[in-house]
């Protein structure tokens, strides 16, 4: 932003305020409602979660996390190559005298760093050729700066600063590859610029390589494959909601059936922050006057809980009922009527 701001001042001069105003309006239009929501809940526009932030800001988190973030994109179907990548990253950390899994820079709930086998899953998808061509494009610009407009060099610096800022602020975790997507997309014009300055044969080979290596993730994608027994063309949309967590399918179908059979319209949820909820909205999409609320919330959003809400039933994944299979909420007794570990459905006694 700073780099493009300087460029705008140089180019537009007195008209820069018009461009600045347009930029501010676009920024507020895209992010304003999220900032307001976060501020109302956390008294901070960015809803800070210190568990995901590096313990301190400095060179060390950049040095370790940038390398690990980039290395994760070089996974391959061949264990020998993955072992080489892992070995290089380990030796690099030994050289800089930093623990590769230092808890100050690695999220505690993430598995330790390892360049294991390539996995065509939306949570772990990698982009090795994007990273490789981005690095080559940066090297090309470095050695040919005088041949091209300084604007493209600034653009490259912006993308590099995005990677460094990402590594500076966030603890490394194995699921970071999916969060790199904005930076990968931003690097596309730079890669195209580099290929445009290559021989035609290089461009053709590069395009073919990109396409060929994209096909396995399309056809054999774990979550939404085109072919195979889980093909998106041979499975219902309801089945596809549970491809990533198939053990949730039966309890969700069973609980939704109980709710519909007993005409239960007010449902409370007692679940963790990482638990699924949205498939239930899909299964009950045809229900009218349906209301579902989170209850017994223990985080910063607890103040938004509606104390007047008395659910007809409770979907419970967090609280252990008493010896009689009951819990109490707002002086009302709820009895377990269905259980499929870890899910329980509890109905108000008397209904």
Where are these regions (language model features)?
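Hydrophobic/aromatic-rich transmembrane helices and adjacent perimembrane loops
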Residues: 1, 43, 130, 160-165, ...
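Signature aromatic-anchored transmembrane alpha helix within multi-pass, membrane-resident enzymes
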Residues: 2-5, 9, 16-28, 148-149, ...
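Repeat-solenoid scaffold signature
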Residues: 4, 15-57, 183-184, 189-196
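Aromatic-rich transmembrane-lumenal/periplasmic boundary elements in polytopic membrane proteins
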Residues: 31-95
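Membrane-interface anchor segments at the N-terminal boundary of transmembrane helices
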Residues: 81-156
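Membrane-proximal, lumen/periplasm-facing interface regions of secretory-pathway glyco-
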Residues: 206-260, 273-278
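Extracytoplasmic
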Residues: 271-306
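Aromatic/acidic, Gly/Pro-rich catalytic loop(s) in extracytoplasmic/lumenal soluble domains
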Residues: 300-351
